[in-house]
A protein has these predicted regions:
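Short, low-complexity N-terminal intrinsically disordered segments enriched in polar/charged residues
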Residues: 1-40, 56-57
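Short, well-ordered beta-strand segments in beta-rich or mixed alpha/beta enzyme
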Residues: 22, 34, 44, 88-97
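A solvent-exposed, acidic/Ser-Thr-rich amphipathic alpha-helical stretch
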Residues: 31-80
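Short beta-strand segments enriched in hydrophobic/aromatic residues
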Residues: 38-39, 95-97, 127
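Hydrophobic/aromatic beta-strand elements that line small-molecule binding cavities or substrate pockets
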Residues: 76-82, 94-97, 109-115
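Residue-level recognition of beta-strand termini and adjacent short loop/turns
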Residues: 83-87
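Short beta-strand edge/turn micro-motifs at domain boundaries
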Residues: 105-131
């Protein structure tokens, strides 16, 4: 049931906050904080296959393997809402991955679905063009 006490502006702000916290935790290598930004099971569609994490156990480790040895940090280039309800926001996202020297490894587009489940906002799934 949709909670009309939450405005679309509040839902969008909550979803953007989730992404900001996700990237901060990712860059800090903080697996606990990173897990707080995700609902589990968590789904990622990329490279023609769906990856599913039932629990947060290997999420950071799996990311580091995907990003490669040259990865140092990532930044959000933009995160734009494309659809919204009081309990779910779809975001058009572009992020960049960088080496330690500041050179760009790549820029990638993705769609993130951030949802409020059991009164907690977190990313439920995404479709990404990143490796």
């Amino acid at each position: 049931m949709e909670d009309h006490s939450v405005t679309h502006a509040e839902a969008i702000a909550a979803a953007i906050d989730v992404l900001d916290r996700h990237f901060a935790a990712l860059n800090a290598g903080d697996a606990v904080a990173l897990a707080r930004t995700l609902h589990f099971p968590h789904y990622r569609l990329a490279g023609g296959s769906m990856q599913v994490w039932q629990r947060p156990d290997n999420y950071l480790e799996d990311f580091l393997a995907r990003a490669g040895d040259d990865w140092h940090h990532s930044t959000l280039d933009f995160r734009k809402p494309i659809a919204c309800s009081a309990d779910k926001v779809h975001l058009d996202v572009q992020f960049s991955r960088y080496r330690a020297d500041g050179s760009v490894l790549g820029r990638y587009r993705s769609i993130w679905v951030v949802a409020r489940i059991d009164q907690r906002w977190a990313a439920q799934l995404r479709s990404s063009f990143a490796a």
